[in-house]
From Swiss-Prot:
Record text on subunit structure and interactions: Homomultimerizes to form the nucleocapsid. May bind host exportin-1/XPO1. Binds to viral genomic RNA. Protein-RNA contacts are mediated by a combination of electrostatic interactions between positively charged residues and the phosphate backbone and planar interactions between aromatic side chains and bases.
Pfam families in UniProt: Flu_NP
Effect ascribed to mutating A332T: In strain: Mutant ts81 and Revertant 81R
Motif Bipartite nuclear localization signal boundaries: 198-216
Protein name: Nucleoprotein
Superkingdom as given in the UniProt entry: Viruses
GO MF, one annotated term: RNA binding
Annotated family: Belongs to the influenza viruses nucleoprotein family.
InterPro entries hit by this protein: Flu_NP
SUPFAM superfamilies: flu NP-like (SSF161003)
Disordered: annotated segments: 1-21
Motif (Unconventional nuclear localization signal): 1-18
Keywords: Capsid protein, Helical capsid protein, Host nucleus, Host-virus interaction, Ribonucleoprotein, RNA-binding, Viral nucleoprotein, Viral penetration into host nucleus, Virion, Virus entry into host cell
Protein source organism: Influenza A virus (strain A/Fowl plague virus/Rostock/8/1934 H7N1)
Length: 498
């Protein structure tokens, strides 16, 4: 993965830039988030939101969704061509929550998309600032990853619901670009490809004609993105097979599911970025912080520092636990839905519990929920330490990929073992090693069998004090090796439905 000389860093993808040095990257990422902040401040002015209302995460999400919808070219075109009852294709809006006489009230607002686009461009020096839009998409995606389980989607494509740790970014829109592709998990890419192949099986014309040629290019591009996430030669060779198939069908689906399972142990490279809600950037800009001059990074100390000094509120339903709501948002902010809970707990400084034990539903409030009983509370988004976000799967030394619980996709570059029940995972690999990919399958299974749960990943990497911004003295946490930490263990969360 690192061998390609043309690799751009994630921040470069994030900002659509060509190769830049560290200072330029920090400046362009800073420019991106300050544009988001300026846009948010302007929207709060337009909507006449009080300071408290502007810090409400639900209001932030509505404003973010409005700008994403205003710039969704494809959907806008579709809405113009297929007018549906009661939907004005030129308008966008959502619920805004205001404090009236000691109660929260919901107000549905509607704006011209053109107007929203104007405000956004104005906040971004007249540019479209696609990078900022992608950044908001990734924040929404990270929030979905922490909030919902994708069991149904997994089962529909023939995958095992226990592979949920491979599903990072599964709700990202197609138009999220290179930065979006970087944060998608192996399972997400596999699922997108399987859906495509199934359409081809059911629809004779899917791969044919002018449209079919474009479809084919998209298919091969997705295969290459997935191939780039794998770190072993055998996995990559199998991806070449899938990509080059004349007429993708069930054999390719089998291969893809096999590869997804193999990724539970031979983990793929998936990027992690701390993308924060727009209101957080708004608060910082309003307080006079100059992101562009100071520079900003999505994978270093900056987001932690920002969250240490930001007060964000959330609406709370009658029987929800505010501490649990905070954990959910903290995990979303750091893209840590698939991280080992032992590591997250250590960094956060308070115990992070599996989702099955959370007394909280999602952050967004449905339009039919009763506002009378709604309360609000401060989200506790601070941390005890900070750690560098990783873009690798935490596999030990070169080709030998290490172990993963059923399973984690590490977010933080912190030394730990990656416990896993090899028997459980290997049981999924019975039988079928014949066919074109037999030698690769055999090789992959051999590598998985030789992976040891006690191997240590990210050797010598540690967390840092919040005062240690240059990351000079790593603190390597001692983690309870016996206690594996899967967030989705014993899960009862709601499904994600569009």
């Amino acid at each position: 993965m690192a061998s390609q000389g043309t690799k751009r860093s994630y921040e470069q993808m994030e900002t659509g830039g060509e190769r830049q040095n560290a200072t330029e990257i920090r400046a362009s990422v800073g420019r991106m988030v300050s544009g988001i902040g300026r846009f948010y401040i302007q929207m709060c002015t337009e909507l006449k939101l009080s300071d408290y209302e502007g810090r409400l995460i639900q209001n932030s999400i509505t404003i973010e969704r409005m700008v994403l919808s205003a710039f969704d070219e494809r959907r806008n075109r579709y809405l113009e061509e297929h007018p549906s009852a009661g939907k004005d294709p030129k308008k966008t809006g959502g619920p805004i929550y205001r404090r009236r006489d000691g109660k929260w009230v919901r107000e549905l607002i509607l704006y011209d998309k053109e107007e929203i686009r104007r405000i956004w461009r104005q906040a971004n020096n007249g540019e479209d600032a696609t990078a900022g839009l992608t950044h908001l998409m990734i924040w929404h995606s990270n929030l979905n990853d922490a909030t919902y389980q994708r069991t149904r989607a997994l089962v529909r494509t023939g995958m095992d619901p226990r592979m949920c740790s491979l599903m990072q970014g599964s709700t990202l829109p197609r138009r999220s670009g290179a930065a979006g592709a970087a944060v998608k998990g192996v399972g997400t890419m596999v699922m997108e490809l399987i859906r495509m192949i199934k359409r081809g099986i059911n629809d004779r014309n899917f791969w044919r004609g002018e449209n079919g040629r474009r479809t084919r290019i998209a298919y091969e591009r997705m295969c290459n993105i997935l191939k780039g996430k794998f770190q072993t030669a055998a996995q990559r060779a199998m991806m070449d097979q899938v990509r080059e198939s004349r007429n993708p069908g069930n054999a390719e689906i089998e291969d893809l599911i096999f590869l997804a399972r193999s990724a539970l142990i031979l983990r793929g490279s998936v990027a992690h970025k701390s993308c924060l809600p727009a209101c957080v950037y708004g608060l910082a800009v309003a307080s006079g912080y100059d992101f562009e001059r100071e520079g900003y990074s999505l994978v270093g100390i900056d987001p932690f520092r920002l969250l240490q000094n930001s007060q964000v509120f959330s609406l709370i339903r009658p029987n929800e636990n505010p501490a649990h709501k905070s954990q959910l948002v903290w995990m979303a902010c750091h893209s840590a839905a698939f991280e080992d809970l032992r590591v997250s707990s250590f960094i956060r400084g308070t115990r992070v519990v599996p989702r099955g034990q959370l007394s909280t539903r999602g952050v967004q409030i449905a339009s039919n929920e009763n506002m009378e009983t709604m309360d609000s509370s401060t989200l506790e988004l601070r941390s005890r330490y900070w750690a560098i976000r990783t873009r690798s799967g935490g596999n030990t030394n070169q080709q030998r990929a290490s172990a993963g619980q059923i399973s984690v996709q590490p977010t933080f570059s912190v030394q730990r073992n990656l416990p896993f029940e090899r028997a459980t995972i290997m049981a999924a690999f019975t039988g079928n090693t014949e066919g074109r990919t037999s030698d690769m399958r055999t090789e992959i299974i051999r590598m998985m069998e030789s992976a040891r749960p006690e191997d240590v990943s990210f050797q010598g990497r540690g967390v840092f004090e919040l005062s240690d911004e240059k990351a000079t003295s790593p603190i390597v946490p001692s983690l309870d090796m016996s206690n594996e930490g899967s967030y989705f263990f014993g899960d009862n969360a709601e499904e994600y439905d569009n």
